[in-house]
């Protein structure tokens, strides 16, 4: 009964109405897809519903309308959407729950640029109509590699400027054994200059280190910049390189330099989490700002250490970028997909991809992720 909750529900209603209005004006058809479906491999566990009429058999609740909307495209419906209820049996998080509602859509015979134009237009229309806010278009684009290298996240918060920097070559100039060992084993050293944070106590720095450890880091090194150079933390190992460090990192007196060494992904995500924590501590996350971006050029596959095989990074129906098709099976880890995420203020708002429309390419993808021809035919024969 609170006014705050009523206001949010009213806004949700207005947003839903504006989405429908915009998409229908752009020749989309709203089509409802089944809720009780066959279980197919997706990103999370299915919720299962026992069948009364066929004892021992189960329906699954949809994690997304993925397969149905692909069938709609094949059937000649060029533009589809629905406000879809989705169900995923996964651990609860701040931005994850067992059921959610998503704006689901699919388009036929389009490029990535066409999709971006539709989504950007929809968000611009919805924000203006419901909140009176003008969103600058087009949205900036970051490759997955750039987002991870600069912000330590594939859903970066762009409301503040702190950027990760590569410290690997500078680490070679120092005498810090841990960093040299990391580099020798093929890892990287990342740096983050926290402007004006040199007055942070060891207790506060230890809290930042704990944030990094949550993401797999072994520790967090630091040094402070003052008028005559650097001091504290690991500064004694870099005394001979202090001027070059300050110059290349563009640090200034009063700054805190945070350093982290590990294999590339762990180093990026761990220091990225520290960056995010600093954004909160320094009140840099303005709730009245909306900073959108497209993250593109994601890897198509990721290595599953436990099962010793390749898994799809998103799902199995994403088209590889054309330049990788000749050597798809030789080096799956290097293959980039035609997929993209829309992010805003550190949150992933949307995810999409260009779908595979060639059954031979689809069979090759199934083979790489471990499906035999028989298994692929049994599970996805209706699609192939």
Give residue ranges: language-model regions.
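Class II aminoacyl-tRNA synthetase catalytic cores and aaRS-like
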Residues: 1-384
């Amino acid at each position: 009964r609170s006014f705050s909750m009523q206001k949010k529900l009213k806004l949700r209603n207005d947003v839903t109405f504006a989405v429908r209005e915009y998409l229908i004006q752009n020749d989309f058809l709203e089509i409802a897809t089944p809720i009780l479906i066959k279980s197919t491999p997706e990103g999370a566990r299915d919720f299962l519903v026992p069948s009364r009429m066929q004892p021992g058999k189960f329906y699954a609740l949809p994690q997304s309308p993925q397969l149905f909307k692909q069938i709609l495209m094949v059937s000649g419906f060029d533009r589809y959407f629905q406000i879809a209820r989705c169900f995923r049996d996964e651990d609860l998080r701040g931005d994850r729950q067992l059921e959610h509602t998503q704006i689901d859509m699919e388009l036929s015979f389009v490029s990535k640029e066409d999709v971006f134009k539709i989504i950007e237009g929809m968000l611009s229309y919805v924000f203006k109509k419901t909140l009176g806010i003008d969103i600058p278009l087009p949205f900036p684009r970051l490759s997955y590699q750039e987002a991870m290298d600069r912000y330590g996240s594939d859903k970066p918060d762009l409301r503040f400027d702190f950027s990760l920097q590569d410290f690997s070559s500078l680490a070679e100039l120092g005498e810090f054994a841990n960093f040299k060992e990391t580099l020798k084993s093929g890892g990287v050293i990342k740096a983050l200059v926290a402007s004006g944070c040199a007055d942070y106590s060891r207790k506060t720095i230890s809290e930042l280190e704990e944030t990094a450890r949550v993401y797999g880091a072994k520790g967090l090194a630091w040094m402070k910049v003052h008028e005559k150079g650097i001091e504290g933390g690991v500064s004694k190992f870099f005394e001979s390189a202090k001027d070059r460090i300050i110059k290349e990192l563009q640090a200034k007196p009063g700054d805190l330099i945070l350093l982290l060494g590990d294999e590339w992904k762990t180093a990026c995500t761990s220091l990225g989490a520290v960056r995010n924590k600093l954004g909160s501590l320094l009140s840099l996350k303005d709730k009245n700002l909306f900073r959108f971006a497209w993250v593109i050029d994601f890897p198509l596959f990721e290595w599953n250490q436990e099962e010793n095989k390749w898994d799809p990074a998103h799902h199995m129906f994403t088209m590889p970028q054309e330049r990788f098709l000749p050597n798809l099976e030789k080096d799956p880890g290097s293959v980039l997909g035609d997929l993209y995420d829309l992010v805003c203020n550190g949150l992933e708002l949307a995810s999409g991809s260009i779908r595979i429309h060639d059954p031979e390419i689809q069979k090759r993808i199934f083979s790489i992720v471990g499906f035999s021809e028989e298994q692929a035919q049994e599970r996805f024969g209706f699609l192939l």
